[in-house]
């Protein structure tokens, strides 16, 4: 019988959430995503030692540039194995500075183009803060497509759609983690708050004709993935991709256009900030995610500095 991974690929674009070249070659996803935490793991792999050294040689003492050069080198190597796109993230410490994020996104695209990679194969990942969404809006108008990450709330999703961003990455597992901790119980299938969040966003986007791609991210188990079968894209860790590849049985499509959704709404900055503030889970998880990515960025910089 066809594996659940192959069945999933029939109605959802499968993306690998990793910088592990071997896993990508084995699992054959369409796209791949990276972030500072995954790049830090990649930096510890012997196969990337040459990329680290080259980044330091080319950066002229600018450690931030060295990190971008390393990210692009990893991204280019991944693109040799996949037909689609790579997502590369802007320094999370810039998450509240619109113009700095625009400039960093433009630099990353410039580095990819210098490496012979067209911008059509790259998504610039940016945190879904108000400032990040505004930066993405500017980049999209300049022909640079974006992936809005660390998205935990319907408010963030609405603002991203209104800004015309190419893709959003709502985080299923981290939402699940928060509710499991605070409610003291487990969740399965359609009752999982993370699954419910992505389902709501998907239905809203399809009902109102938004072109923004919904890519569920941050999964804790195969059940969450199966409950979102039919979502535009799902970015999945090699471990869970492996489990799906080994699983048999029928996988039913759960999300599809045409399901009912709520009326269209519009958000200005005040209503965005209030809506996010009213969602304790999203507020905590957005701040925590930015801090974690910033810490891993600093660790990567320290690693590169040691090579200087």
Curated annotation (Swiss-Prot):
Record EC number: 2.2.1.2
GO cellular component, one term: cytosol
CDD domains cross-referenced by the UniProt entry: Transaldolase_TalAB (cd00957)
Active site: 125
One Pfam family in the UniProt entry: TAL_FSA
Catalytic activity from the UniProt record: D-sedoheptulose 7-phosphate + D-glyceraldehyde 3-phosphate = D-erythrose 4-phosphate + beta-D-fructose 6-phosphate
Enzyme's top EC category: transferase
Main localization (coarse): cytoplasm
Gene Ontology biological process: carbohydrate metabolic process; pentose-phosphate shunt
Record InterPro entries: Aldolase_TIM, TAL/FSA, Transaldolase_1, Transaldolase_AS
Subcellular location: Cytoplasm
Entry keyword set: Cytoplasm, Pentose shunt, Schiff base, Transferase
Recorded metabolic or biological pathway in which this protein acts: Carbohydrate degradation; pentose phosphate pathway; D-glyceraldehyde 3-phosphate and beta-D-fructose 6-phosphate from D-ribose 5-phosphate and D-xylulose 5-phosphate (non-oxidative stage): step 2/3
Gene Ontology molecular functions: transaldolase activity
Family: Belongs to the transaldolase family. Type 1 subfamily.
Role according to the record: Transaldolase is important for the balance of metabolites in the pentose-phosphate pathway.
Binding partners and assembly: Homodimer.
Family matches, as NCBIfam families: PRK12346.1, talAB
Name of protein: Transaldolase
Species this chain originates from: Stutzerimonas stutzeri (strain A1501)
Lineage: Bacteria, Pseudomonadati, Pseudomonadota, Gammaproteobacteria, Pseudomonadales
Gene giving rise to this polypeptide: tal
């Amino acid at each position: 019988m066809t594996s659940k991974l192959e069945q999933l690929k029939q109605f959802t674009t499968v993306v690998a959430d990793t910088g592990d070249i071997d896993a990508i070659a084995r699992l054959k996803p369409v796209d791949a995503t990276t972030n500072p935490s995954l790049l830090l793991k990649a930096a510890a792999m012997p196969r990337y030692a040459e990329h680290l050294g080259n980044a330091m040689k080319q950066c002229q003492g600018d450690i931030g540039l060295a990190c971008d050069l390393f990210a692009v080198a990893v991204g280019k190597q991944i693109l040799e194995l996949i037909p689609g796109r790579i997502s590369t993230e802007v320094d999370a410490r810039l998450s509240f500075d619109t113009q700095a994020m625009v400039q960093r996104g433009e630099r990353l695209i410039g580095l990819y183009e210098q490496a012979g990679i067209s911008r059509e194969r790259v998504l610039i990942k940016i945190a879904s803060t108000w400032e990040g969404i505004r930066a993405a809006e500017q980049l999209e108008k300049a022909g640079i497509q974006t992936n809005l990450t660390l998205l935990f709330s319907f408010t963030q999703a609405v603002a991203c759609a209104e800004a015309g961003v190419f893709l959003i990455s709502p985080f299923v597992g981290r939402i699940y983690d928060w509710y499991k901790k605070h409610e003291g119980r487990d969740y399965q299938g359609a009752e999982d708050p993370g699954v419910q969040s992505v389902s709501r966003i998907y239905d809203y986007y399809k009902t109102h004709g938004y072109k923004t791609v919904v890519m569920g991210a941050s999964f804790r188990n195969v059940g969450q993935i199966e409950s979102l079968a039919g979502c535009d894209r799902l970015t999945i860790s090699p471990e869970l991709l492996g489990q799906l590849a080994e699983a048999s049985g029928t996988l039913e499509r759960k999300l599809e256009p045409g399901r009912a959704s709520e009326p269209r709404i519009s958000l200005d900055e005040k209503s965005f900030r209030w809506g996010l503030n009213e969602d304790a889970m999203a507020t905590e998880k957005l701040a925590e995610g930015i801090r974690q990515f910033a810490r891993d960025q600093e660790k990567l910089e320290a690693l590169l500095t040691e090579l200087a």
